[in-house]
A protein has these predicted regions:
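A glycine- and small-aliphatic-rich helix-loop capping segment at beta-alpha/alpha-beta transitions
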Residues: 1-2, 64, 70-83, 98-104, ...
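ATP/NTP phosphate-donor binding region
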Residues: 1-47, 228
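Accessory alpha-helical/coil subdomains and C-terminal extensions
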Residues: 2-13, 129-211, 219, 298-299
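Short Gly/Thr/Asp-enriched flexible loops that form oxyanion-binding sites at enzyme active sites
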Residues: 58-80, 222-231
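Internal gly/pro-rich beta-alpha loop/helix module
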Residues: 84-157
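C-terminal non-catalytic interaction/assembly regions of soluble proteins
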Residues: 219-299
């Protein structure tokens, strides 16, 4: 849907803020890619330098919204509010959620209380931090949640209410700068399962990958069939991050895996898809696994 049509569908927005729209790209969010992320981050940073712009709302498909939000959380260089919003139901549905979500997103972006909160996601009445937001359900309107930390706040009757802030580094505190980047390092995800074979991972060692995210079982544990491949990856200079396919809880350092011995990185609270985002940006700064572990601890 064109941005103009979205704004026309919710005329009440004009009572909250002076809103102008710009179409950056028109794709399904399942087709999101690094180039769009770089374009979006650069455009947002350019716009937020203007004194007449107080905040930005990004309409986005829900499939990869959590990844885009987290990428922007690490690359936007402003304390002005940046809010992502989408819809789980089509506009033709009996109870479409898009119009109210968009209204609440504009309310959130316009509120002075939203300043310096990091990039936000406004969905189904909740205000969520980009670092902790996860899509938890394939179809439900309450799909976006923060299972490890809870929502930052909520919107009710056109007003925002915040209950907490994130302690993770973001936006103006972030060391990552995409201003002069035209591409991101190649990082892939390996999903673990019982009886996984080495040939699922081996091709990544010779196809230009700079990093591998291992979506392990339990606390990021690694099957014996692919452990040698991942240690070989480290010998070749490919970074390896242990995350987990389990939806909640951290992947902790040196639990059942001796991370220091193998020079693996533990993803902490980040799920595999967000771990990929952080590792790509981390690799633009360094290949030192200890420094990258520090990034995962802080961001």
């Amino acid at each position: 849907v064109a941005i103009g049509a979205l704004l026309d569908a919710v005329p009440e927005i004009k009572d909250i803020a002076n809103v102008t729209g710009e179409q950056i790209v028109k794709i399904g969010s399942q087709d999101m890619n690094d180039q769009v992320w770089l374009t979006l981050a650069k455009k947002i940073n350019e716009l937020l330098k203007r004194p007449d712009i107080d905040g930005i709302v990004i309409t986005h498909g829900t499939d990869t919204m959590e990844e885009t939000a987290y990428f922007l959380n690490l690359t936007v260089k402003s304390d002005k509010p940046v809010v992502l919003v989408g819809a789980m139901r089509p506009s033709t549905a009996l109870s479409a959620d898009g119009p109210l979500n968009l209204y609440n997103a504009v309310v959130t972006a316009a509120a002075k209380e939203s300043k310096d909160k990091g990039v936000l996601v406004a969905m189904n009445g909740l205000i969520l931090g980009a670092q902790s937001t996860v899509k938890m359900n394939t179809v439900d309107v309450q799909t976006f949640q923060a299972p490890n930390s809870g929502a930052l706040g909520y919107v009710l009757n056109g007003k925002v209410f915040y209950n907490q802030v994130t302690l993770k580094k973001h936006t103006t505190q972030s060391v990552f700068d995409v201003t002069h980047l035209n591409a991101l390092p190649k990082v892939g995800i390996v999903y673990s399962y019982s009886n996984i074979e080495a040939d699922m991972v081996t091709p990544m060692l010779s196809n230009g990958y700079k990093g591998i995210i291992h979506a392990g079982v339990g606390n990021g544990n690694i099957h014996q069939n692919i452990f040698p491949v991942l240690t070989d990856a480290r010998q070749k200079g490919i970074l390896v991050v242990r995350s987990s396919r389990v939806p909640t809880g951290p992947t902790t350092l040196d639990a059942e895996v001796d991370d220091a011995k193998y020079q693996f990185v533990a993803s902490q609270e980040l799920n595999p898809q967000k771990s990929r985002v952080l590792l790509m940006l981390a690799l633009t700064k360094t290949t030192d696994w200890k420094q990258i572990q520090q990034y995962f601890n802080e961001y």
